[in-house]
Amino acid sequence: MYRKTYKIFENLLLIVINFFPQITKYRYIRVNGPSMEPTLKNNSILFMKRFNLSTDKLKRFSIIRYKDSVNKFYIKRIIGLPLEKIEIIDSKLFIDSEYQETDILEKNKNYSWMLKKNQIILFGDNYLNSGFDSRKLGPINLSDIQITHIR
């Protein structure tokens, strides 16, 4: 009797764990690829919250998931926020002309973006192997953000 009750409880718990993300604003996401290393390893699991454009505020250096124009998903870090001027000059990051101490940038590359009110700049943490981030794609629209990382 005890064993049967335990098995039923175990199965119910598995159902709840599997369906919890489907009925709430939270999701488990698997990291695919090395673009966020060393912060997030390939195949790591993240607990993330669905992003609501009208109520959620973005924070610089937060980790988010976004989708590109062919509905492929990427996990990246927010570097630039709406209405900011983001520049990378001689491997140094400037936000609205103020130098930001960081070691995130590759050598011998310069970039400059003036963001609109619905745009952000995203980089992967593995700057030499980051794939599809704003250095390749330019600014990302806020409407493309799917979920934000919960720490």
Task: Label every model-predicted segment.
Residues 49, 67-68, 73-76, 87-151:
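Acidic/glycine-rich C-terminal interaction modules and beta/coil loop segments
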Residues 1-74, 81-86, 135-151:
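Protein maturation boundaries and topogenic segments
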